[in-house]
């Protein structure tokens, strides 16, 4: 289970850098914040990844969330194979997209659902819809919440963009080059888990706000859990006429069959999904109140389209995934139990080694922040940004060398799947004890 060579990954990374920016197709994969050679993966089965050098890892990325059932699940594989016999793309409606939409509306209570090709497309489309429905132009987001890479949302964003930037009540600077300040000026920024700040912003600007978009449980600043008073403040934004938009791209169908909103008792006007809803294939969706969704073309005036939207392979994978989750009511309890045991074991390993670590967890999502504060006390973007990223990088490399593939960023969640068992838990905690203790590999 220990890493011995990265020869083929190194060679592929060198080739990739000659033809792809940074050698990867999504920044976090480059290991820039943790150092070392990014592993190029050959295959994935169950709870394991195998790289091009034949090293096997217990996987806690799960393709950044979609693989809640584990990699190469036989039911999902069979559903994709069956769909493949009928063709790969139609550019016309198909039965599976109707079936998946019916299932999503039943599980979540959404009045209508529209499928797109990514989480970014989902959030981008939902906010365009909110503007079209309300006739207003401003959007409110929260510092450290990541909603994909649409221009107007790359403002005080999380994920690979996490910084210590100082925000204000109102517009803030873009988080990326290439985003005009004019775009960013239409995005107002507030503090996650600060109900007073949100209330103040809405009193001042609420009449101009089309939507407030939020992660019910933050995953791209590390896991941040909402406080009850913040949840109450979120519901109050509706009084201004603004729409409440839940970004459940990460949490949808992971924390419950109705995602984090169901778990927390939230009632958003619109919800965005991705990851699990496509069973590991490229997909996104947005949906919610029927009167709002009826503003989407061709029924309404808000345009949104996509060549591959409703792709039959993605619909088959998503349908099989959600049907499997619904048919196994005990899966969320098992995911909870495994992740709780993982958190407890990490806590004990860090304490034994004298390494400052603070663990945040909800269901099968977890972040171990390298900070000397109590578990669960990291609640904001600014709190998370105080983490010891150098210490985390050292620990990450120690885990990787011992056959455990953790998220290669301090500011990301890890994801547990139904394929993780006591065997993987024991391997992980043994690796953690050695990595925290600095034991040579």
Curated annotation (Swiss-Prot):
Cited PROSITE patterns: AA_TRANSFER_CLASS_3
Residues bearing the modification N6-(pyridoxal phosphate)lysine: 275
Location in or out of the cell: Cytoplasm
Record keywords: Cytoplasm, Isomerase, Porphyrin biosynthesis, Pyridoxal phosphate
Cofactor: pyridoxal 5'-phosphate
Keyword Repeat attached: no
EC number: 5.4.3.8
GO terms for cellular component: cytoplasm
Top-level EC class as recorded in UniProt: isomerase
GO biological process: one example: protoporphyrinogen IX biosynthetic process
UniProt-recorded Gene Ontology molecular function terms: glutamate-1-semialdehyde 2,1-aminomutase activity; pyridoxal phosphate binding; transaminase activity
Pathway note: Porphyrin-containing compound metabolism; protoporphyrin-IX biosynthesis; 5-aminolevulinate from L-glutamyl-tRNA(Glu): step 2/2
Superkingdom of this protein's organism: Bacteria
Keyword Cytoplasm listed: yes
Catalysed conversion reaction: (S)-4-amino-5-oxopentanoate = 5-aminolevulinate
Principal location class: cytoplasm
NCBIfam families: hemL (TIGR00713), PRK00062.1 (NF000818)
Annotated family: Belongs to the class-III pyridoxal-phosphate-dependent aminotransferase family. HemL subfamily.
Subunit structure: Homodimer.
Protein name: Glutamate-1-semialdehyde 2,1-aminomutase
């Amino acid at each position: 289970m220990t890493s011995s060579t990265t020869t083929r990954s190194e060679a592929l990374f060198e080739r990739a850098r000659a033809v792809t920016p940074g050698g990867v197709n999504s920044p976090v994969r480059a290991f820039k914040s943790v150092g070392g050679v990014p592993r190029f993966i050959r295959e994935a089965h169950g709870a394991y990844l195998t790289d091009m050098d034949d090293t096997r890892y217990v996987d806690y990325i799960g393709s950044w969330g979609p693989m809640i059932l584990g990699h190469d699940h036989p039911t999902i594989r069979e559903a994709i194979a069956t769909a493949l016999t009928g063709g790969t793309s139609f550019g016309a409606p198909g039965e599976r997209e109707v079936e998946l939409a019916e299932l999503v509306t039943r599980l979540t209570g959404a009045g209508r659902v529209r499928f797109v090709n990514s989480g970014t497309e989902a959030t981008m489309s939902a906010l365009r819809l909110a503007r079209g429905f309300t006739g207003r132009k401003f959007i409110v987001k929260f510092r450290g919440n990541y909603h994909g890479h649409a221009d107007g949302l790359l403002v005080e964003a999380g994920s690979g963009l996490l910084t210590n930037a100082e925000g204000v009540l109102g517009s803030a600077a873009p988080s990326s080059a290439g985003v005009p300040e004019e775009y960013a000026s239409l995005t107002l920024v507030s503090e996650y888990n600060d109900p007073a700040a949100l209330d103040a912003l809405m009193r001042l600007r609420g009449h101009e706000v089309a939507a407030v978009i939020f992660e019910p449980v933050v995953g791209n600043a590390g896991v941040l859990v909402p406080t009850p008073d913040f949840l109450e403040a979120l519901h109050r934004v509706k009084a201004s006429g603004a729409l409440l938009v839940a970004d459940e791209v990460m949490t949808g169908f992971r924390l419950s069959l109705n995602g984090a909103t169901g778990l927390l008792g939230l009632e958003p006007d619109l919800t965005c999904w991705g990851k699990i809803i496509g069973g590991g294939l490229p997909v996104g969706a947005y949906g919610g109140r029927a009167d709002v969704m009826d503003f989407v073309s061709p029924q309404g005036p808000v345009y949104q389209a996509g060549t591959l939207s409703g792709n039959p392979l993605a619909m088959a994978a998503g349908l099989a995934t959600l049907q499997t989750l619904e048919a196994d009511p005990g899966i969320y309890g098992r995911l909870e139990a495994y992740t709780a045991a993982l958190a407890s074991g990490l806590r004990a390993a860090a304490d034994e080694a004298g390494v400052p670590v603070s663990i945040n967890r909800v269901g099968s999502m977890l972040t171990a922040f390298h900070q000397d504060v109590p578990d669960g006390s990291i609640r904001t973007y600014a709190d998370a940004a105080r983490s010891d990223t150098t210490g985390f990088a050292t620990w990450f490399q120690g885990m990787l060398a011992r056959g455990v593939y953790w998220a290669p960023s301090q500011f990301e969640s890890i994801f547990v799947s139904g394929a993780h068992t006591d065997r993987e838990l024991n391997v992980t905690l043994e690796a953690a004890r050695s990595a925290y203790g600095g034991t040579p590999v």
